[in-house]
A protein has these predicted regions:
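Substrate-gating cap/lid region and adjacent catalytic-acid/histidine neighborhood
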Residues: 145
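Active-site-proximal helices and loops of the catalytic beta/alpha 8
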Residues: 5-117, 126-130, 134-141, 153-276, ...
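Histidine-centered active-site/metal-ligand motif
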Residues: 121-122
Length: 301
């Protein structure tokens, strides 16, 4: 649940909304147990994020949005500022290191998470030269991330995006790929490992990276360790939920990747980018035909 312009409502009122929403959610789940809707069996609490213009990272909750307002996260303006039509900053490997220190808790949650974005309807669409790199560094950034529609397809700022009406351009028509009718096939095996992606190379890249993040909580919340050049192990273990998750992320097309700090020998892994299945030997894996990234997770049946 996203609360717009959160600063204009007193934090205790937001907290009441959170409490009442959780109460209503639990009552609904109790009344619908065993029914057709799988959400009745979920355990997650009502989730709330807030927008406060210009707010940035605040993992210790210095602004009180978590403790006094009940928010789980706040939208992070660090990479796309407050100026209309302004330029954007893009995350990098150094951003991963910085954000892992704030949000890579390894267990549980930070006091106040961030929801990081690079494009906004209020300011500008972030369109650096390499949109694949943007997908890599945003979708694998620790903490929460938000993909504004069309980031994944390099949607253009047009249809009303003149200097006198910039916001119309940031809300331009979606540039759906030519094979959009195949979307059901793209999503068919997202819980295990998808085998079909868009023929649009940029979108396919964002799909692979985003699905890897979807399957692995360690990507956004795991404790990060740099185990080799451009190679990171992220681990998340939470006794309360029973989650025990680890991934290795390698930026580059190298065929041999060190994983020993994250996975034991003889562990079977899958590379979410190339689709290959590999087995750890001598603390390493060898990818037969690596892509632009190596995204390693436990093999899923």
């Amino acid at each position: 649940f996203r609360c717009d312009t959160a600063k204009h409502v007193a934090k205790p009122s937001w907290k009441l909304l959170k409490e009442y929403s959780n109460e209503a959610l639990n009552k609904w789940r109790e009344a619908n147990k065993g029914g057709a809707d799988p959400a009745a069996e979920w355990k997650d609490n009502f989730w709330m994020t807030g927008e406060h213009w210009g707010y940035k990272t605040d993992p210790s909750d210095g602004g009180g949005y978590a403790s006094s307002g009940g928010f789980d996260s706040m939208i992070n303006f660090s990479f796309n500022g407050q100026a209309k039509g302004g330029s954007c900053g893009t995350p990098s490997i150094n951003s991963w290191k910085e954000y892992a220190g704030m949000y890579g808790v390894g267990s549980g949650s930070p006091k106040l998470n961030a929801l990081t974005y690079v494009s906004s309807h209020d300011t500008s669409l972030c369109r650096p030269g390499n949109m694949k790199d943007l997908g890599t560094y945003l979708e694998l950034l620790p903490g929460g991330v938000q993909v504004y529609y069309g980031d994944e397809t390099a949607r253009k700022n047009d249809n009303g995006g003149a200097s006198n009406d910039i916001e119309h351009g940031t809300r331009s028509d979606m540039n759906f790929p030519s094979d959009i009718s195949s979307q059901a096939e793209w999503a068919a095996n997202v819980d295990t490992l998808s085998t079909k992606f868009s023929s649009d190379a940029t979108l396919a890249h964002w799909q692979k990276v985003g699905q890897f993040r979807f399957r692995n909580v360690a990507v956004g919340a795991g404790k990060q360790e740099e185990i080799d050049s451009n190679t990171f192990c992220r681990t998340y273990k939470d006794e309360g939920t029973g989650i025990d998750n680890a991934v290795v992320i390698h930026v580059g097309a190298d065929s041999t990747v060190n994983v020993g700090a994250c996975f034991d020998d003889n562990t079977e892994l899958q590379d979410a980018y190339s689709g290959a299945t590999v087995t750890v030997s001598g603390g390493q894996v060898t990818i037969p035909a690596p892509g632009e990234l190596v995204l390693l997770e436990l093999k899923r049946n």
